[in-house]
Amino acid sequence: MKEIAKRDKAKVIPTGATAANRLGFSTQVPMNTIFLTTGSGRKMKLGNRTVTLKHGAPKNFAFRGRLMPELVQALRNIGEHNITQDVEARIGQLFTETPETDTIEYDLLLAPVWMRQVIKKGIKQ
């Protein structure tokens, strides 16, 4: 995906189950991978997997940090009512591994309110 994004001069972020898997919230690897892009949408076959690029809204790419856009997509996939203590602990772990202290405040304002609360709770743990 990085090569395609570089070639097209577009930003690309994983959505849904792909983001959840990449961040360690899920062990399931989706067969049909969907990415949001600032470029044009299309479908590609890579081996036995289908990769779909969908043109995303600018708000999905407004984040300054590298972790937050993917985290927002993963939490959207998990759902507000399915957040567990394990998810909150993993969020804290992610921010320990990838500290984004200079962008976190700005990025939190862009996230939906329920996600903001979950992320803040996870960071405090």
Residue ranges and their predicted role:
Residues 1-3:
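HTH-adjacent hinge/linker in prokaryotic transcriptional regulators
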Residues 5-46:
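Short gly/ser-rich loop at a beta-strand->alpha-helix junction or flexible surface loop bordering the NTP-binding
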Residues 34-35, 52, 70:
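Generic structural signal for residues positioned in beta-strands
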Residues 45-55:
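A short, charged helix-loop
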Residues 55-125:
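Hydrophobic alpha-helical interaction segments
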